[in-house]
């Protein structure tokens, strides 16, 4: 990986995401295995000794969403009870009955892995995919979207820098997309491990991704808006209840 190559060559590194997770081998829907970023954080000692820097999780989500959480902590709240990163859109892609606007490979990884949650006094734990259903009314005309718990880097990063009682990430998939993802899992098409197809080794997930339109080519067909933001609940600087959604809309 480029991350390790930079470490070996004493080169600074920046990434928009973090190293992948691996579910707990026996209790995937309740206990953490290898969390997002664990493999990179485990190398911190060597980067420190070499005097080089790696900035990971620095995109919009994660990245800007984490900055929103820290801003709320320092400028808006005296106590934070809950931080929920909420992502939703009303984007449609003209000419396609089904065409994800984001990498289906990554979407499967995020949405079918056990969602990660952090709570004060309990730490990190996992739950079942598509749990915690919540309809959130997104701003700037996007409107209400059905959101569910999803594994995401913010739940690893925010508790390390912000004192909150609970941190979670919810993705606005909508009922139709949730059904599609459940069907993909039921058919085994989410598997990364290769299977033999008439003498050819093929990963079902890679095959699925190759069968769908490349999101990078769909920009001119996309209509609507997408929103990434951080919902913070707690007490303001005067001790009064407050809830704020800090967001970015494209």
Regions found by a protein language model. Give the residues of each.
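Glycine/charged-rich beta-loop-alpha catalytic/anionic-binding loops adjacent to active sites
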Residues: 11, 47-54, 243-250
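Short acidic, glycine/serine/threonine-rich loops at helix termini
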Residues: 26, 66-68, 94-99
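Flexible, glycine/proline-enriched loop segments at strand-loop-helix junctions
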Residues: 31, 55-60, 141-147
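C-terminal catalytic/substrate-binding lobe primarily of soluble NAD(P)-dependent oxidoreductases
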Residues: 74-250
């Amino acid at each position: 990986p480029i991350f390790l190559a930079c470490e070996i060559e004493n080169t600074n590194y920046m990434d928009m995401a973090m190293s992948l997770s691996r579910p707990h081998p026996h209790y995937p829907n309740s206990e953490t295995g290898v969390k997002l970023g664990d493999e990179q954080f485990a190398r911190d000692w060597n980067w420190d000794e070499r005097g080089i820097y790696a900035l990971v999780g620095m995109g919009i989500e994660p990245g800007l969403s984490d900055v929103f959480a820290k801003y709320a902590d320092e400028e808006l709240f005296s106590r934070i009870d809950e931080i929920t990163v909420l992502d939703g859109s009303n984007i449609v892609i003209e000419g396609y009955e089904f065409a994800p606007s984001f990498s289906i490979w990554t979407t499967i990884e995020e949405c079918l892995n056990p969602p990660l949650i952090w709570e004060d006094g309990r730490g990190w734990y996992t739950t079942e995919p598509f749990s915690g259903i919540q309809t959130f009314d997104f701003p700037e005309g996007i409107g209400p979207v059905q959101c569910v718990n999803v594994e995401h880097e913010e739940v690893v990063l925010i508790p390390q820098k912000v004192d909150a009682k609970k941190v979670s990430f919810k993705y606005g998939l909508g009922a139709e997309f949730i059904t599609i993802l459940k069907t993909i899992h039921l058919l085994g098409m989410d598997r990364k491990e290769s299977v033999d197809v008439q003498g050819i080794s093929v990963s079902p997930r890679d095959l699925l991704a190759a069968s769908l339109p490349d999101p990078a080519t769909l920009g001119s067909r996309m209509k609507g808006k997408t929103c990434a933001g951080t919902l913070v609940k707690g007490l303001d600087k005067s001790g009064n209840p407050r809830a704020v959604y800090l967001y970015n809309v494209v």
